[in-house]
C-alpha cells in the first residue's frame, strides 16, 4: 500500500501543478468564458458541440481540476490512515483538501457571476496553498526529512524569522503577480527596470500595478539572497536548510529572469507559464522550510529536556 501511496502522491502533485499552470493559461489566453457562464456544464452541454480553442483550454482546465479533486481526496484519506504518526500529516491533509475545494468554488463563481480582477487574483494564491500542502505531504510520505536528518534540526530565532517572513511576503508577491495578469497589465510598462524611457514613473492604474509587482519582486530577491548568505555561513552542517535556501535563490533568480523576459518577449505564452511554474516551486520550497521551522521549536524543547535529564 505504501508503494501505491507514493505513486499517488507524485501523480497528485503533478496534477495540481498542471492545474496551476492551466489556470495561468486560461487567464493568459482569455479563455475564462470558453464554456460560457455555465458550470459544471460547458455552454450548457456535457460535451460541447462547438470546440473553439478557448473552449478546449477552459474545458481541459476544468477536467484537470476535477481529477485533482479526486486524487487529493484519495491522498488525504490514505495519508491520514497510514501516516497519522507523522505530526504534520493531518494538518497538511486538511489544508490540501480545503483549499482545493475553495479554489474550485471560486473558479465556478468567477465563471457564473464574474469577479473583479482584485478578487480573481486570490484564486491563484488559494490553488498555490493546496499545491504546496500536497508537495509537503509527498515529502513526508517519501521521508525526505529523515534522509536529511531534519528531525534533529534546531534553528535560531533569526533564521526562523527569515523563513516565516519570506514565506508570508512571497504570498503577497504572488498576489501582486496574479493581479498583473488579471488586470491585463503585463505590458503596461514596456521597459525595465523603469516603466518606460519617456515616463520612468507610472501615471495610470495598470502601470502602478506592474511597477508595484516589480518592486515587490526585487525586495523578495534581495531578502532570499540575504537569507541564503546566512544559511551558507551558519548552516553548512544542516544540509536541509543550507540547500533549501540555495534552491530558493536559484528559483527566485529564474523567476526574476523570466519576469524580465515576459516584458521583452511581448508577454509570450511560454514565459508567462514559466513565470507561474517557478513561483509555484519556490513557494513549495519555502513552505517546506516553514515546516522545518515549526519542528525546530519542538526539537529544541526535546533537546533541553534530554539535557536536564542527563544532568
Curated annotation (Swiss-Prot):
| Single GO MF annotation | oxidoreductase activity, acting on NAD(P)H, heme protein as acceptor
BP terms from Gene Ontology: heme A biosynthetic process
Q: Which Pfam families match?
A: COX15-CtaA (PF02628)
Q: What main location does UniProt list? A: membrane
Report the active site residues: 58
Which cofactors does the annotated protein need, by name? heme b
Membrane topology (Extracellular): 28-62, 113-121, 181-211, 265-271
Query: Which EC number(s) does the record attach to this protein?
Result: 1.17.99.9
Q: Any idea which positions bind heme o?
A: 61, 123
Membrane spanning segments where? 7-27, 63-83, 92-112, 122-142, 160-180, 212-232, 244-264, 272-292
| Pathway(s) where this gene product acts | Porphyrin-containing compound metabolism; heme A biosynthesis; heme A from heme O: step 1/1
Q: How does it sit in the membrane?
A: Multi-pass membrane protein
Q: Detail the disulphide connectivity of this chain as listed in its UniProt entry.
A: 35-42, 189-195
The entry marks the following residues as binding heme b, namely: 213, 275
Q: Which reaction does it catalyse?
A: Fe(II)-heme o + 2 A + H2O = Fe(II)-heme a + 2 AH2
Ordered alphabetically, the record's keywords are: Cell membrane, Disulfide bond, Heme biosynthesis, Iron, Membrane, Metal-binding, Oxidoreductase, Transmembrane, Transmembrane helix
Q: What does this protein do?
A: Catalyzes the conversion of heme O to heme A by two successive hydroxylations of the methyl group at C8. The first hydroxylation forms heme I, the second hydroxylation results in an unstable dihydroxymethyl group, which spontaneously dehydrates, resulting in the formyl group of heme A.
Q: What does the entry's domain section say? A: The N-half (TM1-TM4) and C-half (TM5-TM8) domains are connected by an intracellular loop. Each domain is formed from four-helix bundles and they align in a pseudo twofold symmetry manner. The N-half domain is the substrate-heme O binding domain and the C-half domain is the cofactor heme B binding domain.
UniProt subunit comment: Interacts with CtaB.
Which PANTHER family does the protein's record reference?
HEME A SYNTHASE
Family listed: Belongs to the COX15/CtaA family. Type 1 subfamily.
What protein name applies here?
Answer: Heme A synthase
| Organism this protein belongs to | Bacillus cereus (strain B4264)
In the UniProt record, what gene is named as encoding this protein?
A: ctaA
Amino acid at each position: 500500500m505504501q508503494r501505491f501511496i507514493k505513486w499517488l502522491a507524485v501523480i497528485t502533485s503533478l496534477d495540481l501543478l498542471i492545474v496551476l499552470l492551466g489556470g495561468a493559461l486560461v487567464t493568459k489566453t482569455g479563455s475564462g468564458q470558453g464554456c460560457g457562464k455555465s458550470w459544471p456544464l460547458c455552454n450548457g452541454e456535457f460535451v460541447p458541440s462547438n470546440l473553439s480553442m478557448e473552449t478546449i483550454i477552459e474545458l481541459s482546465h476544468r477536467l484537470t481540476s476535477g481529477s485533482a479533486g479526486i486524487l487529493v481526496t484519495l491522498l488525504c484519506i490514505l495519508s491520514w490512515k497510514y501516516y497519522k504518526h507523522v505530526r504534520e500529516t493531518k494538518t497538511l491533509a486538511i489544508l490540501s483538501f480545503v483549499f482545493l475545494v475553495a479554489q474550485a468554488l471560486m473558479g465556478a463563481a468567477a465563471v457564473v457571476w464574474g469577479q473583479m480582477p482584485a478578487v480573481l487574483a486570490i484564486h491563484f494564491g488559494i490553488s498555490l496553498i493546496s499545491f504546496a500542502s500536497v508537495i509537503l505531504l509527498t515529502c513526508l510520505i517519501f521521508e525526505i526529512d529523515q534522509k536529511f536528518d531534519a528531525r534533529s534540526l534546531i534553528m535560531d530565532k533569526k533564521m526562523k524569522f527569515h523563513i516565516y517572513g519570506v514565506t508570508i511576503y512571497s504570498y503577497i508577491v504572488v498576489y501582486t503577480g496574479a493581479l498583473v495578469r488579471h488586470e491585463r497589465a503585463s505590458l503596461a510598462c514596456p521597459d525595465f527596470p523603469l516603466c518606460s524611457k519617456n515616463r520612468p514613473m507610472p501615471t495610470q492604474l495598470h502601470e502602478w500595478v506592474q511597477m508595484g509587482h516589480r518592486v515587490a519582486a526585487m525586495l523578495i530577491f534581495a531578502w532570499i539572497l540575504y537569507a541564503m548568505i546566512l544559511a551558507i555561513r551558519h548552516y553548512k552542517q544542516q544540509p536541509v536548510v543550507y540547500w533549501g535556501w540555495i534552491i530558493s535563490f536559484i528559483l527566485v533568480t529564474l523567476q526574476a529572469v523570466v519576469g524580465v523576459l515576459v516584458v521583452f518577449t511581448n508577454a509570450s505564452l511560454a514565459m508567462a507559464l514559466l513565470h507561474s511554474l517557478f513561483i509555484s516551486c519556490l513557494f513549495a520550497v519555502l513552505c517546506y522550510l516553514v515546516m522545518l521551522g515549526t519542528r525546530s521549536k519542538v526539537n529544541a524543547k526535546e533537546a533541553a529536556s534530554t539535557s536536564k535529564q542527563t544532568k
